[in-house]
Amino acid sequence: TMNNTAECHDDHSLDKYLFPFVYSIVMMISIPINCISLCASCVQVRKKNELAVYIFSLSLADLLYALILPLWIDYAWNGDDWRRSALLCQISAFLMYMNFYTSTAFLACISVNRYLALVHPLKLQHLRTRRFSLIVSIIVWILESILNSVILVNKEVFNDPCNFTNHTLCYDNYPLEWWQSWINLLRICLGYLIPLIIILVCYHKIYQVVRCNQATLDEEKQKVKKLILNITVTFIICFTPYHIVLFIRSIKEPYTKDLQLLQLLYKVYRITQALTSLNCIADPILYCFVSETARTDILNLLRCCLCLQKHEEDHARDHALCSSATKSSALITYRASCEAEI
């Protein structure tokens, strides 16, 4: 911890405005589009589409994270002061890291699936079945839960090192202790570097095969190039800045007493952490690129929703007209009876 609070001038004003702004936008967009993606992928899973299993898992991870964003907005708005229970802090941090690393894992699974479909369409077909995809998805969820369970068994609320602020930090304390640094380095290797290498190797092989295949139409080649570009760019933009800063923090913080460096690293780290939330928006959009029937499924779902809404509006209007007509009829009958009495 930082002993010399006289030199400690921590400022949480950046977090107070950055996170609520970014997270609010992410939440408003990602919740509806991930719900649509879940429904569309569920339809495809029933049709024995193995790729849809990975898309479903990806959308589920994004939706769970988007649903806890209000807690992180509240935390940032209060100047990085956690005012909820310690257990809720653990659950929120657990779901956040589950989203980070299930997302990278399932993006790697999608890349391998596309590699097998385009480079080895006739070989290894048993690896492109719905059953195999379900098994892989379950294994990913179990492994990620085990790797991130350290969050659920350790204390995750800390007093702000700048003691005069009297803030309670949730999960991301600073400076990092040596054991936290080792866990972070393990996360970087297993959750970031390995999926990144898999994605780059798969798409390099896919690009080579598609480019050299004379039978592939130019339009199909462009689709494959868009797919490669979108998944690679999404992965790099959302996760690379965060993991670079996390790596620097992990090798520097346990062994330095430079307060200014510690605070600078923490601020940059928090900015890159906000950037990772954009994957909740990007992942469902990728669904339109990796599945040929995705756009059709999503459009059908939207039409269905619009039809239901229109039906409800028509029903409400008919009910209002019927009610109005009934009242008018009753009024006419009443007037007629009054005139008869006169």
What do these predicted ranges mean?
Residues 56-59, 100, 134-138, 190, ...:
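Internal alpha-helical transmembrane segments of multi-pass membrane proteins, especially GPCRs
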Residues 100-138, 289-292:
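Class A GPCR helix-loop hinge within the 7TM core
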Residues 3-10, 76-97, 126, 131-137, ...:
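Loop architecture of class A 7-transmembrane GPCRs
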Residues 1-36, 174-175, 184:
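Extracellular N-terminal segment of 7TM GPCRs
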Residues 67, 146-153, 193-200, 231-248, ...:
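Hydrophobic alpha-helical segments of membrane proteins
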Residues 1-10, 160-162, 218, 258, ...:
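Intrinsically disordered regulatory tails of 7TM GPCRs
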Residues 15-24, 50-109, 117, 125:
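Extracellular TM2-ECL1-early TM3 structural module of rhodopsin-like
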Residues 165-177, 188-191, 207-244, 262-265:
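Intracellular effector-coupling site of seven-transmembrane GPCRs
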